[in-house]
Amino acid sequence: MNNCDFSGYATRNDLACGDGRVIRKNAFSDNDGRTVPLVWNHNHTNPEAVIGHALLENRADGVYAYGTFNDTEEGKRAKMLVQHGDVRSLSIWAKILKQVGSDVIHGDIKELSLVLAGANPGAYVDFVMAHGVDEEDELFASYDENIMLHHSAEQDEKKETNSQQKEENKDE
């Protein structure tokens, strides 16, 4: 989703949350495609705490969210904190939970919060997008992704070594 400001897991399946609950696969499948308010730290008493909205996507391993900040001062401040990597945790507020023991098997997500520390260890921002005027001005930053960097000289050396080994094998 290109017009979002960030994305990440709102909640991940099969992880023990801080409150002892475990979200199970498809527990929030009814929320797929739904847009919910993006709130600062689950603050439901102050309308200024609404800092944007999030589009939810049910996946096999949890619920993924595409977040967009609003243009309020609070939204701009939260956007800056996320872009700088200062705040990365996400947390859902859900109602109508159905549980079997500690397993959550169904629920209705009412909001997604940007929090300092979330209950679900897999719920965090993993991608940030900075919008520019032109498409070329866009910046994508990914967190916690394994990125391998190779210097072109290393690849040339590797090709040369492979060629030499092939030549040696022909001579034998």
Regions found by a protein language model. Name each.
Residues 19-31:
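Short Gly/aromatic-enriched secondary-structure transition segments
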